[in-house]
């Protein structure tokens, strides 16, 4: 979601910001997974398979950890995530590895550069179509 991306096209950075909010208990469930799924979809659309896979793995971890706590029949109403679930997810080595990948400057720079190239291409196409 553009709202969470430090720079346009930085879907990994947006996911890291959402994960920081998750770790601080600022987002409930399923809100956190829905926001992450948005970043995952944007990464997939942009062709960034590694970022998409890292975000998808985290979404699955959070969803699996929340299974015993889900309110049945509450639809998409957000519910607080228990501290033990946050601790369980954040202590998982796969979570730590995925978040480190997403937070790495190399990942974020690659995403921003790709978005800039795509934006320039779109501008050139629009100019060509206008003339």
UniProtKB/Swiss-Prot annotation:
InterPro entries from the UniProt entry: RIP_P131-like
Family matches, as Pfam families: RIP_P131-like
A GO cellular component entry from the record: virion component
Subcellular location per the Swiss-Prot or TrEMBL entry: Virion
Magnesium among keywords: no
Main location: virion
Keywords annotated in UniProt: Virion
Residues in the signal sequence: none
UniProt family annotation: Belongs to the viral ORF131/RIP family.
Protein known as: Structural protein ORF131
Taxonomic source organism: Acidianus two-tailed virus
